[in-house]
Each structure stands twice: as structure tokens, then as C-alpha cells.
């Protein structure tokens, strides 16, 4: 089984809300999401098939999944277990903004640690359990495409690679991480954070004026 994990595209900032923050994509994020279907299509063919498109329930993931699901002619199946660790928080700050406006939080995440208010073990157990169920339900030659979050991708990699910290890897917007599951139970991280298809659309690679305009 091949699990293709796609991080969501760039979402907007939400600072005040009466419930959990659930931002939509920015215009730049919409453009990033449009780049994904062509990349995903290369994983289909021959004996292999893209069997399912699944997504976190959070809007930024569902909206990123939509163009790919439409291209493949598949529904987007929402799986609660793929939600990010921040799902219940009343604010959302894109990581590139947190670097400037919430430096302590940014530094903690970049050091590889979940925010202090997050129940780390519960989050990890939820993600790993959901992935195990996905793989168990698939045929050996299936590819499952999962639209999720940087934290979700990272804790799965932490478990597979035996890493100490839960947030080891930078996972870019719309980047692709591929995990292979063998019939014997072996798990292999085939690629991590593939981003060439959106390289020019990542905030760090864009002139400030262009980022402000889109």
C-alpha cells in the first residue's frame, strides 16, 4: 500500500472566533492546491490504482483536496483522525506569520515540539490509529491520497523512523510525503516533503510584493 500524504495549501489567519478556528485558503493557497492533481496523477497506472482520497475535517485540508478529487473522479472522504493538533484552538496563525508575530511558539515548533497546551500522546495515538485503519482497509496495490497537516505527517514519520521529537521535518504547503506499507508490515518513508511542484508558490520563495498581492 502506498500512502501519499499531502499537506494542505496556505490558509488565512484567524485570530478571534467563538469556536475552533477553521480558516479557508488564501488566494495563494488556492493556486497551490491547483498544482497538486497533476503530481498525484502520476501515481496511477498499470497494476496500481488510486483507490481513495481522504482528508482531515478541517477546511484548509478539504479545500486542498477538492481539485485532486475532482480530477480523479473520486469523493473526498473526511476522516476525523487526520485532524491537526490545533483543531480545537480558537486562533490559527500561518507558520510564516508566527515567525514574526508569535516568536516563542514558532521557536518551540521549529525545535520539534508540539505546543505546550496540546495532549501529545492522545494526538499521536489518534493519527497512528487512523493510518493503521486506512492501510488495513486497502488492497496491496492501492494508493491512498490523504490531505492532512504538518503535525500529522510528522508524528507518522516520527513513529516510522524512531525519532525523538514529534515535529522533526519542515513540511511545506502542498508538499508530498510517500509512505510504503508492505504485506509483511514493514513501513518505509519513500519521500519526505516533495515540493518542486509548488516551489515558486511557497511564501519564502516569493517576493514580498507578490505575496501581498495574491
Residue ranges and their predicted role:
Residues 55-56, 125, 147-148:
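Short beta-strand scaffold positions
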Residues 67, 155-159:
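Active-site signature of alpha/beta-hydrolase-fold catalytic machinery across serine-
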Residues 2-77:
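Active-site-proximal alpha-helix that buttresses catalytic centers in soluble enzyme cores
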Residues 3, 142-151:
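Generic beta-sheet signal
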Residues 77-78, 84-97, 136, 140-142, ...:
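Acidic, low-complexity terminal tails and accessory targeting/binding regions
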Residues 70-129, 214:
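Phosphate-handling substructures
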Residues 43-49, 134-142:
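Glycine-rich phosphate-binding loop signature in dinucleotide/nucleotide-binding domains
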Residues 19-28, 114-121, 168:
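Active-site metal-coordination segments of metallo-dependent hydrolases
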Amino acid at each position: 500500500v502506498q500512502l501519499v500524504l499531502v499537506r494542505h495549501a496556505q490558509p488565512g489567519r484567524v485570530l478571534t472566533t467563538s469556536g475552533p478556528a477553521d480558516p479557508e485558503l488564501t488566494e495563494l493557497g488556492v493556486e497551490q492546491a491547483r498544482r497538486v492533481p497533476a503530481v498525484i496523477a502520476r501515481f496511477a497506472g498499470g497494476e496500481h490504482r488510486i483507490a481513495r482520497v481522504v482528508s482531515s475535517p478541517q477546511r484548509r485540508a478539504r479545500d486542498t483536496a477538492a481539485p485532486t478529487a475532482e480530477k480523479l473522479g473520486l469523493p473526498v472522504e473526511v476522516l476525523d483522525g487526520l485532524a491537526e493538533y490545533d483543531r480545537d484552538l480558537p486562533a490559527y496563525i500561518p507558520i510564516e506569520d508566527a515567525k514574526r508575530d508569535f516568536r516563542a511558539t514558532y521557536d518551540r515548533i521549529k525545535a520539534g515540539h508540539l505546543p505546550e497546551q496540546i495532549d501529545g500522546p492522545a494526538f499521536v495515538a489518534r493519527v497512528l490509529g487512523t493510518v493503521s485503519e486506512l492501510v488495513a482497509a486497502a488492497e496491496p496495490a492501492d494508493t491512498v491520497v490523504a490531505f492532512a497537516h504538518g503535525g500529522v505527517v510528522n508524528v507518522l514519520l516520527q513513529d516510522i523512523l524512531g525519532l525523538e521529537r514529534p515535529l522533526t521535518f519542515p513540511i511545506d504547503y502542498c508538499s508530498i510525503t510517500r509512505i510504503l506499507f508492505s504485506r509483511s508490515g514493514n513501513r518505509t518513508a519513500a519521500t519526505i516533503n516533495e515540493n518542486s511542484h509548488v516551489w515558486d508558490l511557497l511564501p519564502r520563495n516569493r517576493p514580498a510584493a507578490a505575496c501581498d498581492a495574491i
